């Protein structure tokens, strides 16, 4: 409980965050102040969530920004009288933990849990209003059992399947590598081996079944940043076009199908291009062609410029254009992707820049079939014509604009059986298999009789084995643990083996927000009624780097689980805020490309390389150990306090913009809190003079107006995520209180200070509670209601009248709004500054512009 005994801290006149912040954090925790009140059924709910952190071991300023923003929003919503769910957890599986454990020779579980404990203590230093009772980590058995349960639900719904897929394979370490483990030269980050492509049987989720809904429902997300929606729209990549079948001259029963959005250019097709793994390749027996093909595959694996160089290998096979029966060559092309469309494209050099370049390099005909102006033939093309226009060289379709021609040629193809209208998506199914130890085991048993059989739900979790072996700088995969692998088939009872792949960590992080409302449930992943109550998340906060994968996977799983009747919501996140990066000054030698630590620089105002005395380039870049520009949050909190760190993070830049760290800006926020501290301490010690003869109506009017302006502007700014301008308004409000406090009645003094406390509280919660108690309150300021502004108090009751003599400004005066013209003249003519300009002169005319100006013509 909060008592005067544990909150009275008037012994010092100095603001010392270390004296108050730990104290208030303990009080809040002891009083369960931020535990979600599930019994408050009469209150409106608000679910505030940050993207949960990976437990790397140390908090960085990017974390601080993310969690402080969400905390401010959660606190503001509590002040609105809402019951707030603001939880925290840990995205704990994955390759970084496995690699870190290998380097240290310990179990990833031990390393991860040590990091969680340390990072949790760091997060608590920030004074976050988190409900820690709902905490979990994705590596907890009581969490990943439900990840496996959801996998089985998706399997039952027909959304899980296996197929062969290409992976990055390290031939020295004999392991699969994630894309980020392959460097820019196509080499393994660990062994240095040239990474190979290898076909492995992998598990997939059918996210493509939801492509159309994922695309269409972006329109519902009107509180998401537009750029994130555009990124998802492009990733889903819907194309409306036509599938066209080309016969192959040499193989009468074979056809090549291509997808195109430009059937209007069909008469201009002069070649077909197929990918290096197209099924037609199997029909090729010419050793010279196959040798070139192998060289091309190696080039595509190794080259980072594969999209720049257009390599073509003639197959000596001929396709027949169905629209005009023309024979066209088939080439294997470096730019055709296996995974998009049909693995074959039609080449129209005259009307596609890539095809034009490819045709020039490979000596292929270029045939123009669209011109800009009707009946006006252009000279030979020097580059591709990609604008709209009219058809030429297209038989019966000549003269049509290309928009109409698309429709007519598609219909012609459908009637003749070689074309079909088709909607295609760029989105591919989600590959969730990982050949690593530290992940959620896939609950599948492989039986020689029954094939791949799902584990019975009563037998989950399939636990990770505790005993691991670290050899050759890697943790042996699950496949090397025979006692773990060997089991019996749930279907036939024969000896069988477990699936040795683990799940992509995105599988664990794509449903965690569903777990928080019932995080301690031992019988189900979540309770339907609680999901329907709390979801969607009202405010989700995280980096824009998660715009596609995490956010798209989370949307997909939500829709798939809804269709399994596990709850009724369509979208997981109502409102999304993607915060910018935190950047800091980095010092780079532009000649060597090396970064220099600021501790090695003698004069930071004129930075030079200590080795060669060359001038260093100063860059503001994302904080990084390798660039020596990281700022340790704990050291900042130790020096200035958590409230200062919070105020700086919120004030320095709008949340969606990148933020540049500056020590002077941090010190500026600290000084502001020091001034606040002194003001309230003086008031509590009766050091502010209150003589009745000093009371002035204009001061009271000014302060009352400032109170209401502050409430209105700060409220609107927080609602609109304009936290930096909200702090600017707090500063203005503070200045008004400081200027007027000696000259207003005691009730208004107290009202202004109390409302300032509440308005400050979401930004700087510790000092707010301390000064709240300094002025005589007993309960926490965080239990108060947010003040409401009085519209009448904002109405102007006076204005500044500009006084001109012969059109030149000579004076200004404040007058009441409803003043009459006669009163304006009277007040103006007695002003000393006016008298000296009109004495001994004849006033010819007085012009009054209502509410603005009086001009005296003499």
UniProtKB/Swiss-Prot annotation:
<feature type="short sequence motif" description="'KMSKS' region">
    <location>
        <begin position="622"/>
        <end position="626"/>
    </location>
</feature>
<dbReference type="InterPro" id="IPR002302">
    <property type="entry name" value="Leu-tRNA-ligase"/>
</dbReference>
<dbReference type="GO" id="GO:0004823">
    <property type="term" value="F:leucine-tRNA ligase activity"/>
</dbReference>
<dbReference type="InterPro" id="IPR001412">
    <property type="entry name" value="aa-tRNA-synth_I_CS"/>
</dbReference>
<dbReference type="GO" id="GO:0006429">
    <property type="term" value="P:leucyl-tRNA aminoacylation"/>
</dbReference>
<dbReference type="GO" id="GO:0005524">
    <property type="term" value="F:ATP binding"/>
</dbReference>
<keyword id="KW-0067">ATP-binding</keyword>
<dbReference type="Pfam" id="PF09334">
    <property type="entry name" value="tRNA-synt_1g"/>
</dbReference>
<comment type="similarity">
    <text>Belongs to the class-I aminoacyl-tRNA synthetase family.</text>
</comment>
<keyword id="KW-0547">Nucleotide-binding</keyword>
<dbReference type="InterPro" id="IPR009008">
    <property type="entry name" value="Val/Leu/Ile-tRNA-synth_edit"/>
</dbReference>
<feature type="binding site">
    <location>
        <position position="625"/>
    </location>
    <ligand>
        <name>ATP</name>
    </ligand>
</feature>
<feature type="short sequence motif" description="'HIGH' region">
    <location>
        <begin position="53"/>
        <end position="63"/>
    </location>
</feature>
<dbReference type="InterPro" id="IPR013155">
    <property type="entry name" value="M/V/L/I-tRNA-synth_anticd-bd"/>
</dbReference>
<dbReference type="Pfam" id="PF13603">
    <property type="entry name" value="tRNA-synt_1_2"/>
</dbReference>
<protein>
    <recommendedName>
        <fullName>Leucine--tRNA ligase</fullName>
        <ecNumber>6.1.1.4</ecNumber>
    </recommendedName>
</protein>
<keyword id="KW-0963">Cytoplasm</keyword>
<dbReference type="GO" id="GO:0002161">
    <property type="term" value="F:aminoacyl-tRNA deacylase activity"/>
</dbReference>
<dbReference type="Pfam" id="PF08264">
    <property type="entry name" value="Anticodon_1"/>
</dbReference>
<dbReference type="Pfam" id="PF00133">
    <property type="entry name" value="tRNA-synt_1"/>
</dbReference>
<keyword id="KW-0436">Ligase</keyword>
<dbReference type="InterPro" id="IPR014729">
    <property type="entry name" value="Rossmann-like_a/b/a_fold"/>
</dbReference>
<keyword id="KW-0648">Protein biosynthesis</keyword>
<dbReference type="InterPro" id="IPR002300">
    <property type="entry name" value="aa-tRNA-synth_Ia"/>
</dbReference>
<dbReference type="InterPro" id="IPR015413">
    <property type="entry name" value="Methionyl/Leucyl_tRNA_Synth"/>
</dbReference>
<dbReference type="InterPro" id="IPR009080">
    <property type="entry name" value="tRNAsynth_Ia_anticodon-bd"/>
</dbReference>
<keyword id="KW-0030">Aminoacyl-tRNA synthetase</keyword>
<dbReference type="InterPro" id="IPR025709">
    <property type="entry name" value="Leu_tRNA-synth_edit"/>
</dbReference>
<dbReference type="GO" id="GO:0005829">
    <property type="term" value="C:cytosol"/>
</dbReference>
């Amino acid at each position: 409980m909060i008592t005067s005994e544990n909150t009275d801290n008037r012994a010092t006149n100095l603001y010392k965050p270390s004296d108050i912040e730990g104290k208030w954090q303990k009080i809040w925790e002891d009083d369960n102040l931020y535990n979600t009140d599930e019994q408050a059924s009469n209150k409106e709910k608000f679910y505030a969530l940050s993207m949960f952190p990976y437990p790397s071991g140390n908090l960085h300023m990017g974390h601080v920004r993310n969690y402080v923003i969400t905390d401010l929003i959660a606190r503001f919503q509590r002040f609105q009288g809402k019951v707030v769910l603001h939880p925290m957890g840990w995205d704990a599986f994955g390759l970084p933990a496995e690699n870190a454990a290998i380097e240290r020779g310990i179990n990833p579980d031990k390393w991860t849990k040590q990091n969680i404990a340390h990072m949790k203590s760091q997060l608590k230093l920030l004074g976050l209003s988190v409900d820690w009772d709902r905490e979990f980590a994705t590596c907890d058995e009581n969490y990943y059992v439900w990840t496996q349960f959801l996998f089985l639900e998706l399997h039952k719904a027909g959304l899980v399947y296996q197929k062969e897929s290409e992976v990055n394979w390290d031939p020295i370490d004999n392991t699969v590598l994630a894309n980020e483990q392959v460097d820019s030269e196509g080499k393994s980050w660990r062994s240095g081996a040239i990474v190979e492509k290898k076909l492995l049987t992998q598990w997939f989720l059918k996210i493509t079944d939801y492509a159309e809904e994922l695309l269409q429902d972006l329109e519902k997300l009107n509180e998401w940043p537009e750029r994130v929606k555009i990124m998802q729209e492009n990733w889903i990549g819907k194309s409306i076009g036509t599938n066209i079948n080309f016969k192959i001259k040499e193989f009468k029963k074979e056809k090549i199908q291509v997808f195109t959005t430009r059937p209007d250019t069909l008469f201009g097709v002069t070649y077909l291009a197929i990918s290096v793994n197209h099924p037609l390749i199997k029909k090729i027996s010419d050793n010279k062609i196959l040798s070139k093909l192998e060289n091309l595959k190696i080039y595509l694996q190794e080259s980072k410029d594969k999209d720049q160089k257009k390599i073509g290998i003639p197959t000596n096979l001929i396709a027949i254009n169905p629209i005009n029966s023309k024979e066209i060559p088939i080439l294997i092309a470096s730019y055709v992707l296996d995974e998009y469309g049909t693995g074959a494209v039609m080449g129209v050099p005259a009307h596609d820049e890539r095809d034009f370049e490819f045709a020039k390099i490979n000596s292929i005909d270029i045939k123009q079939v669209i011109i800009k102006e009707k009946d006006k033939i252009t000279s030979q093309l020097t580059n591709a014509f990609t604008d709209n226009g009219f058809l030429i060289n297209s038989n019966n379709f000549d003269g049509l604009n290309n928009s109409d021609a698309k429709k007519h040629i598609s219909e012609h193809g459908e009637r003749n059986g070689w074309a079909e209208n088709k909607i295609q998506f760029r989105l591919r199914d989600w590959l969730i298999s990982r050949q690593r130890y530290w992940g959620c085991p896939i609950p599948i048993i492989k039986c020689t009789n029954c094939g791949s059989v799902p584990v019975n739900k009563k037998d989950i979790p399939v636990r990770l084995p505790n005993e691991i072996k670290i050899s050759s700088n890697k943790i042996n995969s699950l496949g090397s643990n025979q006692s773990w692998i060997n089991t019996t088939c749930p279907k036939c009872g024969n000896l069988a083996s477990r699936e040795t792949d683990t799940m992509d960590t995105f599988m664990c992080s794509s449903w965690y927000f569903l777990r928080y409302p019932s995080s301690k449930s031992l019988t189900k992943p979540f309770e339907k009624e609680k999901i329907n109550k709390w979801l969607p998340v009202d405010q989700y906060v995280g980096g824009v780097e998660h715009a596609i994968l995490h956010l798209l996977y989370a949307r997909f799983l939500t829709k798939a689980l809804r269709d399994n009747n596990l709850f009724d919501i369509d979208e997981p996140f109502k409102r999304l805020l993607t915060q910018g990066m935190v950047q800091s000054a980095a010092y780079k030698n532009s000649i060597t490309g090396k970064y220099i630590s600021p501790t090695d620089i003698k004069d930071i105002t004129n930075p030079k390389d200590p080795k060669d005395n060359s001038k260093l380039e100063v860059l503001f870049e994302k904080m990084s150990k390798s660039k020596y520009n990281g700022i340790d949050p704990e050291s900042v909190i130790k020096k200035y306090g958590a409230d200062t760190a919070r105020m700086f993070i919120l004030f320095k830049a709008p949340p969606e913009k990148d933020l540049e760290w500056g020590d002077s800006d941090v010190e500026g926020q600290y000084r502001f809190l020091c001034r606040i501290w002194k003001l309230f301490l003086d008031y509590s010690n009766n050091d502010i003079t209150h003589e009745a003869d000093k009371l002035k109506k204009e001061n009271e009017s000014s302060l009352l107006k400032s109170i209401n302006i502050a409430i209105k502007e700060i409220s609107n700014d927080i609602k609109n995520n304009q936290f930096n301008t909200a702090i600017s308004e707090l500063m203005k409000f503070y200045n008004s209180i400081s200027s007027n406090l000696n000259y207003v009645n005691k009730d208004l003094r107290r009202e202004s200070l109390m409302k300032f406390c509440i308005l400050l509280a979401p930004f700087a919660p510790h000092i707010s509670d301390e000064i709240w108690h300094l002025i005589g309150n007993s309960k926490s300021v965080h239990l108060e209601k947010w003040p409401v502004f009085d519209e009448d108090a904002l109405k102007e009751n006076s204005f500044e009248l500009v006084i001109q003599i012969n059109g030149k400004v000579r004076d200004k005066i404040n007058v009441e709004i409803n003043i009459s013209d006669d009163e304006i003249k009277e007040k103006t003519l007695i002003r000393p500054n006016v008298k000296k300009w009109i004495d001994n002169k004849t006033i010819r005319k007085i012009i009054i512009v209502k509410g603005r100006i009086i001009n005296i013509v003499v």
